[in-house]
Amino acid sequence: MKNKVLSLGLGLLVAFALNLQTACAQDIPKDSLTQVSIQTTDGNEYTGYIVAQSPESVSLKTETLGTVSIPKKMIKSIQRIRKEQIVAGEYWYDNPYATRYFFGPNGYGLRKGEGYYQNAWIFFNQVSYGITDNFTIGAGVIPLFLFAGTATPIWLTPKVSVPVKKDKVNLGVGGLFAIVAGEDNSSFGVAYGQLTLGPRDRNINFGLGYGYAGDDWADSPTITISGTYRTSKKFALMTENYVFDTGDNNTVLLSFGGRFIGRHVAIDAGLFIPAEGEDFVAVPWLGVNVPFGHPAYD
């Protein structure tokens, strides 16, 4: 079983790399009414309308620079700009991490061809990728073997997403299925369902999950209430909250923070605060996210 999970995890990483290479070869829209964003290999980004193209270059009509000619060999990516990405006249690039909060998922999935790498506190590592617009798969590891440890947690995170009403109501069903490599009978994880109300960048999410260890499942579910609100092109507020049934009573874990959304990297920073106890305790969260791939849009 462990070898199968390890092989599947490695296979996913190879598939991500192959899809990343394939995604770099993109079709150039021929419709001059379609607004696009062009990223170039020297790190620049241009938005506007393609008015002409030749085998060697693309002519883009921009609002601030007029018409510019961009050599095709310098084009790293071309993405169509959707109307919901124009906010108060400003182009907001996609937030590919909007399918989750600090750690917990919501009802949205990654778009086909879209992926990212997540690292939290150095040890936690996960890669997620959109196989289709409705199916996302992830693989993660805490590489304790690098620190003379033999027991290494590894996991898979499949998720199926169903848009009930596009950009307004989304359902997600999935799980985190893990083992500890180097230990016997070490399987554990959680199976969950998520209901997300609102678009990807501004929503509230209600979740219900049942955890398990080995063959034993929890008697009662864990409840999650989370949300995000993107306040600008480069920043979003986030909260992720849990209610655990610990037997005698419920344990509540609250969190609050934000996501700094760069074009090529994003930083998650926040505090997790247990609601019980007389003393105030706050555990910091720090994560780094790096996108890859190029999603396909309608």
Q: What do these predicted regions represent?
A:
Residues C24-Y116, W121-F123:
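Compositionally biased alpha-helical segments
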Residues A15-C24:
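C-terminal segment of classical bacterial N-terminal signal peptides
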Residues N106-R111, N134-F135, K234-L237, V265:
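Short, surface-exposed connector motifs at secondary-structure boundaries
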Residues L60, S77, N119, I137-A139, ...:
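Short hydrophobic/aromatic-rich beta-strand segments that constitute the beta-sheet cores
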Residues M1-L10:
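Bacterial N-terminal signal peptides that target proteins for export
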Residues L110-K112, A120-F147, A151-K159:
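Transmembrane beta-barrel domains of bacterial outer-membrane proteins
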Residues A148-T228, K234, M238-D298:
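Outer-membrane beta-barrel translocator/channel fold
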